[in-house]
From Swiss-Prot:
<feature type="binding site">
    <location>
        <begin position="117"/>
        <end position="120"/>
    </location>
    <ligand>
        <name>substrate</name>
    </ligand>
</feature>
<keyword id="KW-0479">Metal-binding</keyword>
<dbReference type="GO" id="GO:0019630">
    <property type="term" value="P:quinate metabolic process"/>
</dbReference>
<dbReference type="GO" id="GO:0007165">
    <property type="term" value="P:signal transduction"/>
</dbReference>
<dbReference type="InterPro" id="IPR000760">
    <property type="entry name" value="Inositol_monophosphatase-like"/>
</dbReference>
<feature type="binding site">
    <location>
        <position position="117"/>
    </location>
    <ligand>
        <name>Mg(2+) 1</name>
    </ligand>
</feature>
<feature type="binding site">
    <location>
        <position position="118"/>
    </location>
    <ligand>
        <name>Mg(2+) 2</name>
    </ligand>
</feature>
<dbReference type="Pfam" id="PF00459">
    <property type="entry name" value="Inositol_P"/>
</dbReference>
<dbReference type="GO" id="GO:0046854">
    <property type="term" value="P:phosphatidylinositol phosphate biosynthetic process"/>
</dbReference>
<dbReference type="InterPro" id="IPR033942">
    <property type="entry name" value="IMPase"/>
</dbReference>
<dbReference type="GO" id="GO:0006020">
    <property type="term" value="P:inositol metabolic process"/>
</dbReference>
<feature type="binding site">
    <location>
        <position position="262"/>
    </location>
    <ligand>
        <name>substrate</name>
    </ligand>
</feature>
<dbReference type="InterPro" id="IPR020550">
    <property type="entry name" value="Inositol_monophosphatase_CS"/>
</dbReference>
<protein>
    <recommendedName>
        <fullName>Quinic acid degradation cluster protein x</fullName>
    </recommendedName>
</protein>
<dbReference type="GO" id="GO:0046872">
    <property type="term" value="F:metal ion binding"/>
</dbReference>
<feature type="binding site">
    <location>
        <position position="262"/>
    </location>
    <ligand>
        <name>Mg(2+) 2</name>
    </ligand>
</feature>
<dbReference type="GO" id="GO:0008934">
    <property type="term" value="F:inositol monophosphate 1-phosphatase activity"/>
</dbReference>
């Protein structure tokens, strides 16, 4: 089945399948976590065993057996139900050779993009901000997104034209308020430290920290770049950053370094809820440049929550104004990728 023959009825069926698959995969994550709880209860007076993991590209880029088991479960279910569909999973991709890794999702056939456990570091520390992320793409565009955060009891779902939902009953966003007139002032700003920790004055870590301080500093500070945001949040999960922006709990998410599986499901949910997503890196003419659509594989993302209109400003105008004010305060990040 090619994307040209994916009918509305078929998309509904795929959506139903994806939602159930997300629930089942979330249950597997929770079962693995509970096993650690039960082992600790049974051996309360003894030293607890630690969660074993393997480093990939760095000490903060890790994989557990749970990551691999859950991805294998998801991939098997998809291959059984939709054998003609393509599949890209984080762990499958990581194990492929550099020469065979695809740069971008440009498949003309329907494609599933999966992160079996986003927030692996959180999971190893039993911090509840971890989830499974499942996206379905048509012509390279996310049209279905499912994010299950089992320890939080939260399920985020969306299908193009059918709305975005929390736990299948609450429409997203929870509220649709205008963007603050002083944005980024009055906003909750979400960002991540990332996995690039190289100690270089012009490295991504330093650029991020400078941007964080600009966003947080008092108005008039930092050479006029002080944003005085209400707060800065870092969840350790790009997928959940997107979900909470779609929910309206975060006003802004700014990030570089993510991959397709980190963001595909969240983008589907965010856009269906009415959020706006573009490139994290500011153009030279940030005040007047056209705000481009994000490229899924670009690794550079700036997101503004769903918004409502205000007197004299449409919702879209408020979102675009906020994007420009963020661009004015952040550094360009160095995450290059062929084809992006």
């Amino acid at each position: 089945m090619t994307s040209r023959t994916t009918t509305a009825t078929e998309l509904d069926e795929i959506y139903t399948f994806a939602v159930q698959l997300g629930k089942d995969a979330g249950n597997l994550l929770m079962e693995a976590a509970r096993l650690r709880f039960s082992n600790n209860n049974a051996n309360h007076d003894k030293e607890s065993t630690t969660q074993e993991f393997t480093e990939k590209d760095s000490a903060v880029d890790i994989v557990t057996q749970t990551d691999e088991d859950v991805e294998a479960f998801i991939k098997s279910a998809i291959n059984t139900r939709y054998p003609s569909h393509d599949f890209i999973g984080e762990e499958t991709y990581a194990k492929s050779s550099q020469s065979t890794r695809p740069y971008l999702v440009t498949h003309t056939t329907p494609t599933w993009v999966v992160d079996p456990l986003d927030g692996t570091v959180n999971y190893t520390h039993l911090f509840p901000m971890f989830c499974v992320s499942i996206a379905f793409l048509v012509d390279g565009t996310p049209v279905i997104g499912v994010i299950c955060a089992p320890m939080l009891g939260q399920l985020f779902t969306a299908c193009k034209g059918r709305g975005a939902w929390l736990n299948e009953t609450q429409r997203l966003p929870l509220v649709r308020q205008p963007m603050p007139k002083s944005a980024p002032g009055g906003c909750v700003f979400s960002c991540e430290w990332g996995k690039d920790r190289k100690d270089r004055p012009e490295g991504n870590l330093y650029r991020k920290v400078e941007s964080f301080v600009n966003m947080a500093a008092e108005v008039g500070g930092r050479g006029g770049k002080g944003g005085m945001v209400h707060g800065v949040r870092s969840l350790g999960s790009a997928t959940l950053d997107l979900a909470y922006t779609a929910m309206g709990s975060f006003d802004i998410w700014w990030e570089g370094g993510c991959w397709e599986w980190d963001v595909a499901a969240g983008i589907a949910i965010l856009q269906e809820a009415g959020g706006l997503i573009t490139s994290a890196n500011p153009p030279e003419d940030w005040a007047t440049a056209e705000i481009p659509d994000v490229k899924l594989g670009s690794r550079l993302y700036l997101v503004v929550r769903p918004a409502g209109p205000s007197e004299g400003e449409t919702a879209r105008e408020g979102q675009e104004r906020t994007i420009r004010e963020v661009w004015r305060r952040v550094r360009a990040l160095d995450y290059t990728r062929p084809g992006a």
